């Protein structure tokens, strides 16, 4: 029987990414794990609906044996079986992030025995998670360059707190993974903005986009009034397309916060990214660790080595025979993986 990997859910930033990465890696490597103090660093520790859905999705996809899969649990033991391609559908039952559930199981399905389609219902545009737009426009184009065939479709927008959204991903098994090197982003080619409105006055989106345009020359700007009862909700997206990659920055409207304040939040993050020569933004850096580790090679530059990034690296190194280096440079950090 494979050795059980013991993980401390309180390590590093103590969030849900430790659990999600462990589930992905356990399925891929066949190594069981047990985790204590799940999400100990959060105001509400233990498994919330989104995390529980990720556990149960992973369990179904690989026929795992699992103990501790209940709301609020801070302990989990997960023993994986073989990864099975197929049609899967999961419902979070709240506005929890569909994208984080998908990002838990999709890496395993890159190694499945056949094609898969995974549909998840919940939130698609959440404050503390990658949006559906980030997955489709930023993450998946980079995965394609690594040899991964995966396409996510946004079925219906879902905002906090109502949820009610859905997204589906079709994924093919990967024959091999190529490394990816992102040292310089190159010249900025195009900057676009999009305001999404669900049961929110149209002028809110107009003001958000106008405020962004005062900061950046926009090649394209859109205000999209969503229909179908998916609100209330508001998201402002700024896409920066460079020669080597596209980055996306987002902020979400909340009651009591002006449209101008939402736009200024996005502008602040984007300006901070553009002020550094680093290729990759802080959040995208987190999303690249697992695929690069699975490829066994790759490198990128990032302005800041966050606790989230370093914690994710530590978890990956427990499961895979790879080593990451995170070297400080004059303009940030060079992150490199080798086997």
UniProtKB/Swiss-Prot annotation:
Active site residues according to the UniProt entry: 308
InterPro entries, per database record: RNA3'-term_phos_cycl_insert, RNA3'_phos_cyclase_dom, RNA3'_phos_cyclase_dom_sf, RNA3'_term_phos_cyc, RNA3'_term_phos_cyc_type_1, RNA3'P_cycl/enolpyr_Trfase_a/b, RPTC_insert
Reactions accelerated catalytically: a 3'-end 3'-phospho-ribonucleotide-RNA + ATP = a 3'-end 2',3'-cyclophospho-ribonucleotide-RNA + AMP + diphosphate
Annotated keywords: ATP-binding, Cytoplasm, Ligase, Nucleotide-binding
First-tier enzyme category under EC: ligase
Transmembrane segments: none
Subcellular location: Cytoplasm
GO cellular component terms listed in the entry, alphabetical order: cytoplasm
Entry-linked Gene3D superfamilies: RNA 3'-terminal phosphate cyclase domain, RNA 3'-terminal phosphate cyclase, insert domain
Residues binding ATP: 103, 283-287
Any GO MF annotation of the entry: RNA-3'-phosphate cyclase activity
Domain of life: Bacteria
Biological process, per Gene Ontology: RNA processing
Main localisation: cytoplasm
EC number: 6.5.1.4
Pfam entry (one): RTC
Family as reported in the entry's similarity comment: Belongs to the RNA 3'-terminal cyclase family. Type 1 subfamily.
Annotated function: Catalyzes the conversion of 3'-phosphate to a 2',3'-cyclic phosphodiester at the end of RNA. The mechanism of action of the enzyme occurs in 3 steps: (A) adenylation of the enzyme by ATP; (B) transfer of adenylate to an RNA-N3'P to produce RNA-N3'PP5'A; (C) and attack of the adjacent 2'-hydroxyl on the 3'-phosphorus in the diester linkage to produce the cyclic end product. The biological role of this enzyme is unknown but it is likely to function in some aspects of cellular RNA processing.
NCBIfam families registered for this protein in UniProt: PRK04204.1-2 (NF003246), PRK04204.1-3 (NF003247), RNA_3prim_cycl (TIGR03399)
Name by which UniProt lists this protein: RNA 3'-terminal phosphate cyclase
Gene this protein is translated from: rtcA
